[in-house]
């Protein structure tokens, strides 16, 4: 399949509008051309600074604009982060993601996050951060410290975006992704379904992602988790088949990207998740919590993997581990 960056909305809509089973079959066929069919990349996400975010994202418990009852926490110590990363690796994660509720990191924060990247990288884990907007200098320093991925989601279509966020623009997000790409890091960018958007908005989101100069290496497809106290607390729940359609279309138009099951997975049945894997999802966040929202725990995931015959993608060994293996050979 030829890799394309010129997908039109009409083409993407034609994929969405296929009969459900035809769409899932096509997505699984594309998936098998580029990935091992039964291998899932497992990531762990840790909040390194929680709450009091100045942004007004209407879905988010961490926004200072809403009364979500979330207790804000100061940034956590680097050694605590390293301990959590080591535990994540031992439980089967190959990528460790660190998120801070900032509009953007201040210069005083940079030594803290750079040390964190270096220490987590030394464990043999892929590293990812989501810290808000970046300038080019910050992106380059993160890359030099060893950061593999930077997450900055588009959230929704350009047209629907202003209904969800007013404190940063859609182009602000694209600019940060440009800085990440130019620094040589891998881009992690996706969105959220179930925000009250239309299917046309989901098409618009995927078109933005699939027409970037390089497809994002990782594409999280989140299901809204309604949070009490936020403006979207009472939004009508999206049917799960529409979420699976979105995953399938993402797989077809971005065949080399990891498509990740992210927020909202905790409320899904094993059968729903199996369909998502059939539709081409091959990455997920494991652990009891995603920043501040509930998530399927490691024990549930181990049972699910065993039931479906799935295996976790392996983390890379550290230099020390390679040395021990060489000595015992």
From Swiss-Prot:
Keywords for the protein's UniProt record, in alphabetical order: 2Fe-2S, 4Fe-4S, Biotin biosynthesis, Iron, Iron-sulfur, Metal-binding, S-adenosyl-L-methionine, Transferase
Gene Ontology MF annotations: 2 iron, 2 sulfur cluster binding; 4 iron, 4 sulfur cluster binding; biotin synthase activity; iron ion binding
Superkingdom per UniProt: Bacteria
Pathway it works in: Cofactor biosynthesis; biotin biosynthesis; biotin from 7,8-diaminononanoate: step 2/2
One GO-annotated biological process of the protein: biotin biosynthetic process
Pfam families according to UniProt: BATS, Radical_SAM
Residues noted as binding [4Fe-4S] cluster in the record, renumbered to the chain: 53, 57, 60
EC number: 2.8.1.6
PROSITE patterns: RADICAL_SAM
Cofactor info, note text: Binds 1 [4Fe-4S] cluster. The cluster is coordinated with 3 cysteines and an exchangeable S-adenosyl-L-methionine.
Domain Radical SAM core: 38-262
Required co-factors: [4Fe-4S] cluster; [2Fe-2S] cluster
Record: residues binding [2Fe-2S] cluster: 97, 128, 188, 260
Reactions listed under catalytic activity: (4R,5S)-dethiobiotin + (sulfur carrier)-SH + 2 reduced [2Fe-2S]-[ferredoxin] + 2 S-adenosyl-L-methionine = (sulfur carrier)-H + biotin + 2 5'-deoxyadenosine + 2 L-methionine + 2 oxidized [2Fe-2S]-[ferredoxin]
Coiled coil: none
Role description: Catalyzes the conversion of dethiobiotin (DTB) to biotin by the insertion of a sulfur atom into dethiobiotin via a radical-based mechanism.
Oligomer and partners: Homodimer.
Family according to the record: Belongs to the radical SAM superfamily. Biotin synthase family.
The name this protein goes by in its record: Biotin synthase
């Amino acid at each position: 399949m030829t890799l394309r960056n010129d997908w039109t909305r009409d083409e993407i809509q034609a994929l969405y509008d296929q009969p459900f089973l035809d769409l899932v079959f096509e997505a699984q066929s594309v998936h098998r051309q580029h990935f091992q069919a039964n291998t899932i990349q497992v990531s762990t996400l840790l909040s390194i600074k929680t709450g009091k975010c100045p942004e007004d994202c209407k879905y988010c418990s961490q926004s200072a604009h809403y009364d979500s009852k979330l207790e804000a926490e100061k940034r956590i110590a680097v050694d605590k982060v390293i301990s959590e990363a080591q535990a994540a690796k031992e439980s089967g994660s190959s990528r460790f993601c660190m998120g801070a509720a900032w509009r953007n990191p201040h210069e005083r924060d940079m030594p803290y996050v750079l040390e964190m990247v270096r220490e987590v990288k030394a464990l043999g884990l892929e590293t990812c951060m989501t810290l808000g907007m970046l300038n080019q200098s910050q992106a380059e320093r993160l890359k030099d410290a060893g950061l593999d991925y930077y997450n900055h989601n588009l959230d929704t279509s350009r047209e629907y975006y202003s209904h969800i966020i007013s404190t940063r623009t859609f182009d602000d997000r694209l600019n940060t992704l440009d800085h990440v790409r130019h620094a040589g890091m891998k881009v992690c960018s996706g969105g959220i379904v179930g925000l009250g958007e239309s299917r046309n908005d989901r098409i618009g989101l995927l078109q933005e992602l699939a027409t970037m100069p390089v497809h994002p290496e990782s594409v999280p497809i989140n299901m809204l988790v309604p949070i009490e106290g936020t403006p979207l607390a009472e939004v009508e729940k999206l049917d799960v088949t529409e979420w699976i359609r979105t995953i399938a279309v993402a797989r077809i138009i971005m065949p080399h990207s990891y498509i990740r099951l992210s927020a909202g997975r905790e409320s899904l049945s094993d059968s729903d998740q199996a369909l998502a894997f059939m539709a081409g999802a091959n990455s997920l966040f494991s652990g009891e919590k995603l920043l501040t929202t509930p998530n399927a725990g490691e024990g549930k995931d181990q049972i699910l993997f065993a039931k479906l015959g799935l295996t976790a993608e392996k983390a890379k060994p550290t230099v020390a581990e390679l040395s021990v293996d060489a000595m015992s050979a």
